[in-house]
């Protein structure tokens, strides 16, 4: 799972096997290690109700998706989910959860064997 943060925007991109695991288990998680005892954990979790939202607690980013959005996203060609979450200080956090597609140009060192086929490959 890829995590991209830019300003007040948070994006998760999931490979095919990660989408399958999320559909089956209701969660996927990954982390980035910064050294001994220091890591950033990020997770995508299915919840029964609510809205697409994110929390940050104790170095763990959790993005939650209600089943009514998660199920069709996992089981169809739907590319992504998007929401804006108020931060409580007059700002918003933009959330994106997307299926990870292969790049149109091959990049060295990039393993895309588990990525979704790019729909623009057939232009």
Where do the PLM segments sit?
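Mid-chain, well-packed structural core segment of small domains
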Residues: 50-87
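Acidic (E/D-rich), amphipathic helical modules within compact regulatory domains
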Residues: 3, 12-13, 19-20, 26-32
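A low-complexity, Ser/Thr/Gly/Pro-enriched, surface-exposed linker/loop concept
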Residues: 26-47
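C-terminal charged interaction modules
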Residues: 80-123
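Residue-level detector of beta-strand structural context in well-folded domains
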Residues: 1-3, 52
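Short, structured motif recognition centered on aromatic/hydrophobic residues
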Residues: 3-5, 10-14, 61-65
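Short, surface-exposed beta-strand-loop junctions and turns on beta-sheet-rich folds
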Residues: 18-21, 69-71
